[in-house]
């Protein structure tokens, strides 16, 4: 039970950080403006993403909300079943849950997701903190599952 409580607190803290950064961006940067943050590496901007990655499927908020809920519920179920597995499995699932819920909050409360990080050195989608959680979480989860498969678990 203690491990579940710790994971729940971590999820809440991660969501809080995501929402705090988004709130700061909305208050400090006008929509569409780009400001250098780490020169030649990352700029900050304020984008209202009404779609998915690379702004695909614009204005399909209900679809994204349903998909997000299904993924988050699935991740919570899988986490519950695998809570005693490797640290990395738990970490990956924790990040996926936090990232999914962070963007879900935006979609339900505002009708769009606030994105802010623009990589200056590559033509890549503008993304947010929750997207980072999701990406890192999926990578960690895949590596953990691959490692378990190799080890025969």
Regions found by a protein language model. Name each.
Residues 1-153:
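Alpha-helical transmembrane bundles and membrane-interface segments of multipass inner-membrane proteins
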């Amino acid at each position: 039970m203690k491990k579940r409580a710790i994971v729940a607190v971590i999820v809440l803290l991660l969501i809080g950080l995501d929402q705090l950064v988004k709130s700061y961006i909305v208050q400090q940067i006008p929509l569409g403006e780009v400001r250098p943050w780490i020169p030649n590496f990352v700029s900050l901007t304020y984008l209202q993403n009404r779609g998915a990655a690379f702004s695909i499927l614009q204005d399909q908020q209900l679809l994204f909300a349903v998909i997000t809920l299904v993924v988050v519920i699935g991740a919570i179920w899988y986490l519950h079943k695998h809570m005693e597995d490797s640290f990395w499995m738990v970490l990956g699932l924790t990040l996926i849950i936090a990232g999914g819920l962070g963007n879900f909050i935006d979609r339900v409360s505002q009708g769009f997701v606030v994105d802010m990080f623009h990589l200056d050195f590559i033509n890549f989608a503008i993304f947010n903190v929750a997207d980072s959680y999701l990406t890192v979480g999926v990578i960690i989860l895949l590596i953990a599952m691959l490692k378990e498969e190799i080890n025969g678990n």
